[in-house]
Amino acid sequence: TAPTAIRSLIALGDAPLEGKSLDSLRVLGTVGEPINEEAWNWYYEKIGKSRCPIVDTWWQTETGGILISNLAGITPQKAAHATFPLPGIQVLLVDENGIVVEGSDSTKGIPSELVQGNLCIKYPWPGILRTTYNDHERCRQTYFSTYENLYFTGDGCSRDTEGNYRITGRVDDVLNVSGHRIGTAEVENAINMYVDVVESAVVGYPHDIKGQGIYAYVILSKDVTDDSLTRQDILQTVTRIIGAIAKPDKIQFVKGLPKTRSGKIMRRILRKIAEGETSNLGDTSTLLDPAVVNEIVVGKI
């Protein structure tokens, strides 16, 4: 099942489990998005009765199959970790410059500190994608151009001293909402289809149930008089164009967006505000109008 479903059950307490026999369960699975430790432990203790192994798999449509996972009853499991690459899968962590991140693997005599990086794969495997809609160049640019001679998954990842891998989430502007990958640009385009929207910017923020929630900053035309009605209309527009899964969890109406002098939206700032990290917004010296940021912080939902 997906971690989102597990978190939803946790919110209901023990009531859904009362009177249920779970004796026939042998193996549990979690897939679709990274699972947090609280959800993993609840799943293991309440559903699996601390006896059923949890298979936490990592894979993508593009990989054609599971690449990182524990093997039920054979290899060790660890809460919230996909654990080890399957045989033949050469996994690497690299920094933003493509330099391989070493460390945190006691089996190789490397110092024991947690390391993080971008998850890449060094060599091809049987299920690897061959093209993207017969557009080979598009495929190359999307998956193989970020780091030379590596397949870039688009995911961030950490590795511990035993060599266990833990997926930390997407490193680009693709949100993982309840296990569904949703592009922020796609949601923005849908929001902007509504007649009274001038401009919008969408970012993700931590959500207890969904993993990531969708936070939308929206500039409305001056003719709008009823914010609540407009908010509902925007949600309906997004549902119609993309689907209910892409509806913003929070919509904040703003007078302006933080932009550089060249017109680029500073999404980093919007993301920090949505996450509640308003005390450390980083460098704002390149903003065209810094006052916009203060207005957004004050109006944060």
Residue ranges and their predicted role:
Residues 32, 59, 83, 155, ...:
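Active-site glycine-centered loops adjacent to acidic/histidine catalytic or metal-binding residues
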Residues 84-88, 99-143, 182, 277-279:
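Conserved ATP/PPi-binding loop(s) of AMP-dependent carboxylate-activating enzymes
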Residues 125, 130-131, 149, 156-246, ...:
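AMP-binding/adenylate-forming catalytic core of the ANL superfamily
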Residues 4-7, 33, 124-127:
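Alpha-helix/helix-capping structural signal
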